Each structure stands twice: as structure tokens, then as C-alpha cells.
Curated annotation (Swiss-Prot):
Xref: PROSITE patterns: RIBOSOMAL_L27E
Protein name (Swiss-Prot/TrEMBL): Large ribosomal subunit protein eL27
Principal location: cytoplasm
Organism placement in taxonomy: Eukaryota, Metazoa, Chordata, Craniata, Vertebrata
UniProt cross-references to InterPro entries, sorted A to Z: KOW, Ribosomal_eL27, Ribosomal_eL27_CS, Ribosomal_eL27_KOW, Ribosomal_eL27_sf, Translation_prot_SH3-like_sf
Encoding gene per record: rpl27
Protein species of origin: Ictalurus punctatus (Channel catfish)
Length: 136
């Protein structure tokens, strides 16, 4: 069977705090490592989705409603459901990597990087489906 968990692939988080959230694989580790002897992936996703915006709203209200809260986390493949979709959001690999979990300051920086990139993509209007809450 081919490897389908690749960077850029959109996945659904199935378990834990971020269950039901959409995320993008930043780095996949199919064979596991010494500290995590199972296949896992570093993902970055949306914790709080942007709210609905209408034409009658002012600039301030639109700006406030267009905010996104991001997360960066390592998940076991068992807790991710891959979709057929891919998103090419260029996250900086030097900032968003597995080393960020050692230091809270680095983790904040990584979350900030993800947030900025997600908001940038949201404002261009591409991949609209990615920025909408999954209804289930």
C-alpha cells in the first residue's frame, strides 16, 4: 500500500482536545522514532475557525471575525483521518518543527507562524472549505 500521509495533506483530528478540527500535515514520520515508536505526524491546524462575514459589516467587525486560532501538535496516525484534499500553505519549517515542544516560547512562535499563514490564506479567499467548521 502506498504512503498517503504526506506534507500538505488535509487531515481530520479524531481524538483529544482538537477532535473534529481540520489540520495540515507539516511533517510525517512513517517509521517512528526512538521516543515515539509508532507512525506519527506533526500537524498544524485550526483551533478556532473564522466567523461568518456579511457585506453589511464594517471593516473593524470583519477584521475581528476573520481571526483564526491555530495549533501545532504531534499526532499518532490512529488519531488522524486523511482526506483526499491537499493544501499548499507554506509553513516555515525552521519555526514549525518537532523541537518546538521542548520550549514554550518556541511553541508560541510556531503557533503564531501557523496563525499568520492561515489568516493570509483565508484573506486571499483560496481553500474556503478548509476554513469552515466541520458540521457533524
Amino acid at each position: 500500500m502506498g504512503k498517503f500521509m504526506k506534507p500538505g495533506k488535509v487531515v481530520m483530528v479524531l481524538a483529544g482536545r482538537y477532535a473534529g478540527r481540520k489540520a495540515v500535515i507539516v511533517k510525517n514520520i512513517d517509521d517512528g522514532t526512538a521516543d515515539r515508536p509508532y507512525s506519527h505526524a506533526l500537524v498544524s491546524g485550526i483551533d478556532r475557525y473564522p466567523r461568518k462575514v456579511t457585506a453589511t459589516m464594517g471593516k473593524k467587525k470583519v477584521a475581528k471575525r476573520s481571526k483564526i486560532k491555530a495549533f501545532v501538535k504531534v499526532f499518532n496516525y490512529n488519531h488522524l483521518m486523511p482526506t483526499r484534499y491537499s493544501v499548499d500553505i507554506p509553513l516555515d519549517k525552521t519555526i514549525v518543527n518537532k523541537d518546538v515542544f521542548r520550549d514554550p516560547a518556541l511553541k508560541r512562535k510556531a503557533r503564531r507562524e501557523a496563525k499568520v499563514k492561515f489568516e493570509e490564506r483565508y484573506k486571499t479567499g483560496k481553500n474556503k472549505w478548509f476554513f469552515q467548521k466541520l458540521r457533524f
